[in-house]
């Protein structure tokens, strides 16, 4: 029974982190769809704040043992790749 609860907490923690990562991904995709200048100070501030917040959430979940460190790193890496693609798309515009 206790192991089922731990697994449930881990699944919930990972699902919440993925949901937060998806919100950031949507911000990036909106910018890509519109090719809005990624150097906009407001855009950068919002995205930086969101990415920092997610990294802290992931760190907390890892420290609690709810999320594997590699899973957390992969979530951030995926967002960083998308952000890099946005910058590449804008510079080729």
UniProtKB/Swiss-Prot annotation:
> Which parts pass through the membrane?
none
Q: Which cysteines are joined by disulfide bonds?
A: none
Pfam families recorded: DUF1507
Q: Which family does it belong to?
A: Belongs to the UPF0358 family.
- This one is known as UPF0358 protein BLi01701/BL02974
Which organism is this protein's natural source? Bacillus licheniformis (strain ATCC 14580 / DSM 13 / JCM 2505 / CCUG 7422 / NBRC 12200 / NCIMB 9375 / NCTC 10341 / NRRL NRS-1264 / Gibson 46)
């Amino acid at each position: 029974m206790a192991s089922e609860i731990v697994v449930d907490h881990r699944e919930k923690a990972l699902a919440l982190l993925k949901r937060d990562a998806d919100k950031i991904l949507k911000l990036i995709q909106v910018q890509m769809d519109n090719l809005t200048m990624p150097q906009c100070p407001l855009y950068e501030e919002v995205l930086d704040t969101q990415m920092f917040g997610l990294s802290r959430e992931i760190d907390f979940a890892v420290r609690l043992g709810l999320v594997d460190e590699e899973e957390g790193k992969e979530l951030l890496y995926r967002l960083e790749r998308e952000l890099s693609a946005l910058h590449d798309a804008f510079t080729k515009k």
